[in-house]
Amino acid sequence: MKKLLHTLLLFAVGLFAACQAPTSGGDVYLNDFLDDLTAQTDAGPAIRAALSHCARIRAARLILPGGELRIRPDLAVEKYQFISNNDEGLKRIAFDLVGLQDFTIEGADTKLLFTGFVSPFNLERCRNITIRNLSIDFTRTFHSEGTVRAAGNGWLDLEFPDKYRCDLTDGCLRFLDDEGRVYPYSSLLEFDTQRCEPAFHVDDYWLPAHTIPAERRPNGWIRIFRSDLKAAIGNTMVFGAARRLNPGITVSDSQGIAILDVKLHHCGGMGVIAQRSRDIGIERMEVVPAPGKKRMISITADATHFSNCGGQIRLIDCTFENQKDDASNIHGLYMPVDTIFDRERIWVRWGHSGHCLLYTSPSPRDPKTSR
């Protein structure tokens, strides 16, 4: 009798737990993993926990809470990435989706506000994923902007708003955020402040040393020096980000991706970069400067970029404005050249781990694999 009662009790406990657990294919609410403090300081750990839970129960949707979520890189997912036409390196990622299928991130008009060097979204080996109804911005942009206040032979005086904090180190200009992170730059480009577009017939000033000689004037303006510098008074000088470190949405080895009603106000690389993927639809996406923040630039590279992709690529009713490069690029095979043997033969290689080439030794019974 005791054994029977024990068995029935275990069954009842198991049944109760099963009833309480989310069912496969259901909705998961990020609010269940958040509290008021983490939402306003760093929602990153809650996002990691929620996505892990979604993968475990095969949830259909992760529903964000609306309002504003602040996200930092400190406790974000960390992985080394090779991303086409962006800089490789160790990345911190907020929403890291790996191997998910038939899954939607429902933004519910949530404003994702990032601080520091963090990539908002990464999709790897996914199928039938939708990201919708959210906006992305950063507390400090990866580029910097200053207003031209005076000009002379080989110099410009620039006034920087407080949001583009700067100082001088070894006689050269350096940009930082409020926490001391350095934001390197590698180019200057003049913009017409009134028309919000590159000034007429301006030159690109490339800075191989990723800096420029400068001094602080008594009135607080910064004077920069270069022999060929020129710009119109009142225009905006944009200091372009030196590297493409943190794209907005990265898609790799995936299929059936939909990006709907997403507003991308800033990121430190391309907006949407897809590689080795197929069937990608982007609808009503806006890559535009953040309203009310008086920025000239939206994002620091292409709005969208597709490399080694197949199937259908659809861009429908999108707005791409003031990004620092193309609205879209769609490439075919894209691999670095390793060796040029002669005018008719080259050796190319994949820049990504996991790709193999099978070749056969002189003995057909002894195949070998080379990575």
PLM region spans:
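Sec-dependent signal peptide recognition
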Residues: 2-10
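Conserved small/polar residues in nucleotide/adenosyl-binding loops
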Residues: 359-365
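Acidic/polar low-complexity surface segments
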Residues: 73-90, 95, 141-245, 286-305, ...
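Beta-propeller domains
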Residues: 234-235, 241-257, 265-278, 289, ...
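Acidic Gly/Asp/Thr-rich repetitive segments characteristic of extracellular carbohydrate-active
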Residues: 30-63
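Right-handed parallel beta-helix
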Residues: 102-111, 127-138, 255-266, 278-291, ...
